Curated annotation (Swiss-Prot):
Sections of the chain in a coiled coil: none
Xref: InterPro entries: Beta-lactam/transpept-like, Beta-lactam_cat, Beta-lactam_class-A, Beta-lactam_class-A_AS
Chain's gene name: bla
Pfam families to which the protein is assigned, alphabetical: Beta-lactamase2
Name of protein: Beta-lactamase CTX-M-8
Gene Ontology terms for molecular function: beta-lactamase activity
GO CC annotations on file: extracellular region
Residue positions of the active site: 73
EC number: 3.5.2.6
Superkingdom, natural source: Bacteria
Activity regulation description: Inhibited by the beta-lactamase-blocking agents clavulanic acid, tazobactam and sulbactam; in the DH5alpha strain of E.coli.
Species for this entry: Citrobacter amalonaticus
Length: 291
């Protein structure tokens, strides 16, 4: 009896050792990524948040992923998605025309400024907000929805309990350290972006439209995309604000595999600090190396 017990214990020990040895390379790889992100953060002098979700197996790479960061213009994805959600039941909402006045223009209006004293449809405003980061377009979307709290309500309705939009453009970009207004976490945003673009938060037609808009973004070449192989397809939304806040959220289609969801948020201690898209590109390269 004792001989059998000792043999069984030896087999269990051998199995445990084999399991540990088998997982050691994965652990070392994950630890290496964390160390590289920490080194990047330290060298950049700011605070970095990263969340990567591999939709093939739901594996996650996280760095400060549960800390709050100012969203800045990455919040435009939620506003546009809320309008798309309306279009599931209000078939003509995207073609609804909105008047553009000179008094509507604020600090960045590359598309809406061309339509002063005219109109734009909600579809055109959504495209302007997502693909050119037009701030007046964002405000028009928010106004149509009924205010920032309605954008937050949409987030709650699709299962995001972290996102909060409190203000309109341009004040939502103040990004004051410790200010919870207009913030989310990298992980929450990654999960929501996945739900909106690859999941069931939107109908098939609306989901396809959102993906098309994101793939047509004109502002992201120097951010996440710059850290990826040129053959990969990217749909993203950038954002920037005070304290050198520099953000990008993306759906990524590597060649021959399931999509990746990547959120990179970065902010700095000085209010007048310059944007650091290079930090986002470096973070993207670190976490996607090996895919």
């Amino acid at each position: 009896m004792m001989r059998h017990r000792v043999k069984r214990m030896m087999l269990m020990t051998t199995a445990c050792i084999s399991l540990l040895l088998g997982s050691a390379p994965l652990y070392a790889q994950a630890n290496d990524v964390q160390q590289k992100l920490a080194a990047l953060e330290k060298s950049s002098g700011g605070r970095l948040g990263v969340a990567l979700i591999d939709t093939a197996d739901n594996a996650q790479t996280l760095y400060r992923a549960d800390e709050r960061f100012a969203m800045c213009s990455t919040s435009k994805v939620m506003a546009a998605a809320a309008v798309l959600k309306q279009s599931e039941t209000q078939k003509k909402v995207l073609s609804q025309k909105v008047e553009i006045k000179s008094s509507d223009l604020i600090n960045y209006n590359p598309i809406t400024e061309k339509h002063v004293n005219g109109t734009m449809t909600l579809a055109e405003l959504s495209a302007a907000a997502l693909q050119y980061s037009d701030n007046t377009a964002m405000n028009k979307l928010i106004a149509h929805l009924g205010g920032p709290d309605k954008v937050t309500a949409f987030a709650r309705a699709i299962g995001d309990n972290t996102f909060r939009l409190d203000r309109t453009e341009p004040t939502l970009n103040t990004a004051i350290p410790g200010d919870p207004r207009d913030t989310t976490t990298p992980l929450a945003m990654a999960q929501t972006l996945r739900n909106l673009t690859l999941g069931s938060a939107l109908g098939e037609t609306q989901r396809a439209q959102l993906v098309t808009w994101l793939k047509g973004n004109t502002t992201g070449a120097a951010s996440i995309q710059a850290g990826l192989p040129t053959s990969w397809v990217v749909g993203d939304k950038t954002g920037s604000g005070d304290y050198g806040t520099t953000n990008d959220i993306a759906v990524i289609w590597p060649e021959g595999r399931a999509p990746l969801i990547l959120v990179t948020y970065f902010t700095q201690p000085e209010q007048k600090a310059e944007s650091r898209r290079d930090v986002l590109a470096a973070a993207a390269k670190i976490v996607t190396d090996g895919y």
